[in-house]
């Protein structure tokens, strides 16, 4: 299975600052800051705050539209192979265009002009703005494999199956795992059960598929 790593808001902010200072020191003042949806939008907002210039727009590759301006700065959260950034550049019609990213896989074919940090090996990065979405998906995958899991089994499997250390998870996102479980419960995706003083979770998707009574 893929390996996952969570990053905190403070770490993301430090990457944004690093990228922003590179741009300022380079003397580049873009007319337009193009955020690649959806992760690039959050990074672009912070970077723009430091730059103090540039109109902010979002570019969705699933719904492509040409962007025209004199100078552009393209912002993404993560560059893996570089195909996303390369495809985005085809839609930007500007005299001057520079690229930036918070993180980049070391062996990426695309090297941005401004970069926060490298990833040595491929890892699925759980950014703060995707935390609930990504963790929900992983939890539901685990509950699909077993009828029910208690809190400790769930945390153990997040580590053994996806590399998410429970302690690091709590340090970087205090209380957020409990929030994700609560959200899934409120959405009707999972069921919380208390037995002998312990809390267990069941997937309601699995129960529905099996035709069991949900109560």
Language-model regions, residue ranges each:
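PRPP-associated nucleotide enzymes
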Residues: 1-215
